[in-house]
């Protein structure tokens, strides 16, 4: 029996002992070395050959990932590691660092209890590091730190042992600043990473060595000796003396929580049901004997096996043949249960609470689905990712015969990657696919062509805009087609704090609130008046609808239809049919026909919508465009060509930081200006540039450009170039 098979046999025994399980992920900025670290950990734990690790990129098993040299999906692997004579099972998820694939990071964080934050010792803490730390702490996932590429400090930057330690102190301080900023108050001190406590390790994932203060004491190695090994080209010897997998996995087992410990404080964060119910208690204690509760964090589409749902089991036992309920999709039967080891799935007969598992047979499950043995389990909190899709492509099948297949493929893809939004138009045959950036869409289109074998034609990338208003407008009269009902809506910008609270998930969307009083209190705290908060009717996207009327007859019966009008108006604004952002919509008055037959959907919905549109015209309509913050590291002598390129794309340079010979330029650029940026910047600098970006919210389109941009969007959508004004809505 080979070492890999032997370890799989050990893993089968450990899945039944929650105290011996660690569910972790590795999260970092792009190219800081996450996948190399994962592969060398898996090899060291005997799950793949050691010569190949780091070159093989086991977890980057998608053809696209290996070609681009970046991780696109979050891949999983389980491995066995021994500490102090006891064996432990570590379920590891490798997550992408590229901003376009941030949705995968969010979903991976839901499945794990601990995270290894990887920071490149030369680059230090970068923007995406901050994003992943924030995401981990929001999900109450405990961090430890691995400082990678330490050999570069010695061989490239020529630092001595003392300067190297100073660099570590700066990185540790920066990471702890993020932990203080984003950790839940009860953990902000307790979870600080600390060299003496053994929650920091450093080394070179590529060269397969690592050390921490506890390890330096065990292996009797000093900083000076590390310096000597690396500077004299003896990293192979160092790797034999201080193997990466031993040091890092020891740190994980000693400092990160097992599922039983973690679920006590994580469940109240991710599940808002009754903690005293049978299933609530079972999840808090990670109990095998309770009902099944599982959250799907990823759907993998396999050409042979079909859809595989990967997720975290919080309570109960799932067996082959178990009948389970998938939230929003009904009852289904488990066909195959397996553990994931990189691309290999190892079939098993049953799995107990606290594990990460892959299941075939969960019909209708998508990333985010709740799976339970109870038909009425309260679903888990939705996974909020920090950014909306910002770039869209129109896509159609090259051959008409492929049209039905393309529609199926698009539905499948949006299931597997919920950060892709798909808009299917059966009538025109042109479908829209929206993602987090140009690269995200490129990879998705590649998969449609190569994995699903559908030939497609795509448009140039289009930017996803938003609409809002400048000031207060209305109350504006909207009349029903039969003229028997009139509504008077007023609109104005929603306070910024309320928008942030909705985006952060502190204020939930919807119109049926479980605890409406708490939502009202949060709205008031974020900036609405007491009366406005009491008038809450509905929250949709980043928009809020309020009822400010008093004692109007029949209004209650009509409110559902008015919510429909509000949602329709927010989905397609009056300027360019784009979604509306950050709007406060207040119903100030209404006149209704006493006979309900005269105030049905066909009367009320258009009247409400036209009233909101008219009020928005009076309030001064504004088009917003998505922005990105761009970080570009470039040698000093070619800095000019980079700033030129940015200015041509309406970019504004916000900061420049010198780091040795390199300069890091930080700029804010509209997403519209970022299209085609990758190839342009490569040719402008002869490829001597490292850059990445993160989404940075929305900003107004410059006044002098708005009219042209609106006309282009409207023409693309088959509308007349000029938007209607308030006189038009008053005349309806």
Swiss-Prot record:
Recorded GO MF terms: GTP binding; GTPase activity; translation elongation factor activity
GO CC entries: cytosol; ribonucleoprotein complex
Subcellular location, record wording: Cytoplasm
Pfam families, per database record: EFG_C, EFG_III, EFG_IV, GTP_EFTU, GTP_EFTU_D2
Binding site for GTP: 28-35, 94-98, 148-151
SUPFAM superfamilies referenced in this protein's UniProt entry, alphabetically: EF-G C-terminal domain-like, P-loop containing nucleoside triphosphate hydrolases, Ribosomal protein S5 domain 2-like, Translation proteins
Modified residue annotations for Diphthamide: 598
Residue stretches making up the tr-type G domain: 19-260
Chief location: cytoplasm
Entry-linked InterPro entries: EFG_II, EFG_III/V, EFG_V-like, EFTu-like_2, G_TR_CS, P-loop_NTPase, Ribosomal_Su5_D2-typ_SF, Ribsml_uS5_D2-typ_fold_subgr
Annotated PANTHER family: ELONGATION FACTOR-LIKE GTPASE 1, TRANSLATION ELONGATION FACTOR-RELATED
HAMAP family per record: EF_G_EF_2_A (MF_00054_A)
Protein name (record): Elongation factor 2
């Amino acid at each position: 029996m080979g070492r890999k098979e032997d370890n799989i046999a050990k893993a089968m025994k450990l899945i039944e002992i929650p105290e011996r399980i660690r569910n972790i992920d590795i999260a970092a900025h792009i190219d800081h070395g996450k996948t190399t670290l994962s592969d060398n950990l898996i090899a060291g734990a005997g799950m793949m050959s050691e010569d190949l690790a780091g070159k093989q990129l086991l977890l980057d098993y998608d053809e696209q990932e290996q070609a681009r040299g970046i991780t696109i999906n979050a891949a999983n692997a389980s491995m066995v590691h021994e500490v102090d004579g006891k064996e432990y099972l570590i379920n590891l998820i490798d997550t992408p660092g590229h901003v376009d694939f941030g949705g995968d990071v969010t979903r991976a964080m839901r499945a794990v209890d601990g995270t290894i934050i990887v920071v490149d010792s030369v680059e230090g803490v970068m923007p995406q590091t901050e994003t992943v730390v924030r995401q981990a702490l929001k999900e109450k996932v405990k961090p430890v730190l691995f400082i990678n590429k330490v050999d570069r400090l010695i061989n490239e930057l020529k630092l001595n042992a003392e300067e190297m330690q100073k660099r570590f102190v700066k990185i540790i301080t920066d990471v702890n600043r993020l932990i203080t900023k984003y950790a839940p108050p009860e953990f902000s001190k307790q979870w600080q990473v600390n060299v003496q406590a053994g929650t920091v390790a450093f080394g070179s994932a590529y060269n397969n060595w690592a050390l921490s203060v506890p390890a330096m004491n065990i292996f009797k190695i000093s900083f000076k000796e590390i310096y000597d090994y690396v500077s004299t080209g003896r990293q192979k010897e160092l790797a034999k003396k201080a193997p990466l997998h031993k040091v890092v996995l020891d740190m994980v087992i000693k400092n990160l929580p097992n599922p039983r410990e973690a679920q006590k404080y994580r469940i109240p964060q991710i599940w808002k049901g009754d903690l005293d119910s049978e299933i609530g208690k079972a999840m808090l204690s990670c109990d095998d004997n309770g009902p099944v509760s599982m959250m799907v964090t990823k759907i993998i589409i396999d050409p042979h096996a079909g859809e595989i749902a990967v997720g975290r089991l919080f309570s109960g036992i799932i067996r082959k043949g178990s009948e389970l309920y998938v939230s929003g999709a009904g009852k289904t039967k488990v066909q195959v249960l397996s553990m994931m080891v990189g691309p290999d799935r190892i079939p098993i007969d049953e799995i107990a609470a606290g594990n990460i598992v892959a299941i075939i047979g969960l019909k209708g499950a998508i990333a985010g689905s709740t799976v339970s043995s109870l038909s009425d389990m309260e679903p888990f909190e939705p996974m909020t990712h920090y950014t909306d899709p910002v770039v869209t492509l129109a896509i159609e099948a090259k051959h008409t015969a492929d049209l039905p297949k393309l529609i199926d493929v698009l539905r499948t893809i949006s299931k597997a990657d919920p950060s892709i939004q798909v808009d299917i138009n059966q009538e025109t045959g042109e479908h829209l696919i929206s993602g987090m950036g140009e690269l995200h869409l490129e990879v998705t289109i590649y998969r449609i062509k190569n994995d699903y074998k559908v030939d497609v034609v795509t448009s140039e990338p289009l930017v996803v805009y938003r609409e809002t208003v400048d000031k207060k407008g209305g109350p504006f009269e909207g009349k029903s087609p039969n003229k028997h009902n009139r509504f008077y809506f007023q609109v104005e910008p929603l306070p910024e704090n309320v928008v942030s609270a909705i985006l952060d998930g502190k204020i939930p969307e919807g119109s049926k609130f479980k605890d409406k009083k708490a939502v009202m209190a949060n709205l008031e705290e974020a900036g609405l008046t007491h009366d406005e908060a009491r008038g809450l009717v509905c929250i949709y996207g980043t928009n809020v609808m309020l009822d400010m009327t008093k004692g109007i007859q029949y209004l209650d019966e009509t409110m559902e239809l008015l919510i429909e009008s509000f949602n329709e108006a927010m989905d397609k604004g009056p300027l360019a049919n784009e979604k509306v952002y950050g709007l406060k919509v207040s119903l100030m008055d209404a006149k209704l026909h006493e006979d309900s037959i005269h105030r049905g959907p066909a009367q009320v919905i258009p009247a409400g919508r036209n009233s909101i549109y008219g009020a928005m015209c009076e309030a001064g309509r504004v088009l917003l465009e998505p922005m990105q913050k761009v970080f570009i590291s470039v040698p000093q002598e070619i800095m000019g060509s980079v700033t030129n390129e940015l200015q041509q794309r309406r970019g504004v340079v916000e900061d420049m930081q010198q780091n040795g010979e390199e300069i890091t330029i930080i700029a804010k650029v509209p997403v519209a200006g970022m299209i085609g940026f990758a190839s342009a910047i490569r040719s402008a600098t002869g490829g001597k540039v490292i850059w990445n970006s993160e989404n940075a919210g929305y900003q107004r389109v410059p006044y002098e450009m708005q009219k042209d941009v609106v006309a282009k969007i409207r023409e693309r959508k088959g509308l007349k170039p000029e938007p209607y004004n308030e006189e038009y809505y008053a005349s309806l």
